[in-house]
Regions:
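Cleavable N-terminal signal peptides
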Residues: 9-10, 20
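Zn2+-dependent peptidoglycan hydrolase active-site motif and core
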Residues: 133-136, 140-183, 213-217
Length: 251
């Protein structure tokens, strides 16, 4: 009888803890939890299956939060170019730098491949300013979504590959945008952004980007969520289309 009472008490405590956890997830706090998870993935301090389960669990709460905050729907055809206030840009390897072979999101900071595009700005002296305007080049969100992870602490000597970064969950297109090598991060986890909102400034942060051969650029990727598993997707067509529209609008 005593043992049965113990089991009953234990069951009640587990139910209560589960309810408390769900209440936490039902608020904007879920972005803070995602940010914490993101750093555990990068540092390799969490099991892959556990990380995948948590991402799958967090996503519905992020989507709900986005809708509660009246986030705007932005289709792929409405994506905007991720840079603003620049004189000229060019793509690494003319946009042929996307490689997703052997890539796995849960490899953390030691991911293989390059499932992204690098966009260089005009900065020959590498002072992080556009050589013509003498001003920083803004990074803007390509779509709408919720900021779920950032890094603002990177410093020289850090082994973090992407340096300072921003990750935004695109609710409309069920995917994750990753912007990295940022010099100044302008958003925080929990922020709801629209297409064109400033999220940072182009830089050279990161364990390789900061080295002498490194160029001032933005590294940007888009990953479709498949039940919590971020799978990279080639998006050069959408990127060039957005660039073309940006150039037309700035004439």
């Amino acid at each position: 009888m005593q043992f049965l009472k113990y089991l009953l008490i234990l069951a009640i405590l587990m139910l209560l803890s589960g309810n408390i956890y769900s209440q936490e997830l039902s608020t904007s706090a879920v972005s803070g939890l995602w940010d914490k998870l993101d750093k555990e993935i990068i540092n390799g301090t969490i099991d892959k299956s556990d990380a995948e389960d948590l991402m799958e669990e967090y996503e519905p709460y992020v989507i709900r939060y986005f809708k509660e905050q009246n986030g705007k729907t932005v289709k792929k055809s409405e994506w905007v170019f991720p840079l603003n206030n620049y004189t000229s840009i060019y793509y690494r390897e003319n946009g042929n730098d996307y490689r997703d072979e052997n890539y796995d999101y849960f490899q953390g900071s030691n991911t293989k491949g390059h499932p992204a595009h690098d966009i260089m700005i005009l900065d020959d002296n590498k002072d992080l300013l556009d050589d013509s305007t003498l001003k920083p080049v803004d990074i803007v969100s390509m779509s709408s979504g919720v900021v779920v992870a950032t890094d603002t602490t990177w410093d020289i000597g850090s082994l973090l590959r992407g340096g300072k970064y921003v990750k935004i969950f695109d609710v409309t297109n069920n995917g994750l945008f990753y912007y990295s090598h940022i010099s100044v991060v302008s958003v925080k986890p929990g922020d709801v952004v629209n297409a064109g909102d400033k999220i940072g400034e182009v830089g050279r942060t990161g364990r390789k980007a900061i080295l002498k051969p490194g160029k001032t650029h933005l590294h940007v990727s888009f990953l479709i969520s498949e039940n919590g598993y971020p799978v990279p997707e080639e998006f050069i067509t959408e990127l060039r289309y957005a660039e073309k529209n940006n150039n037309l609008n700035n004439k």
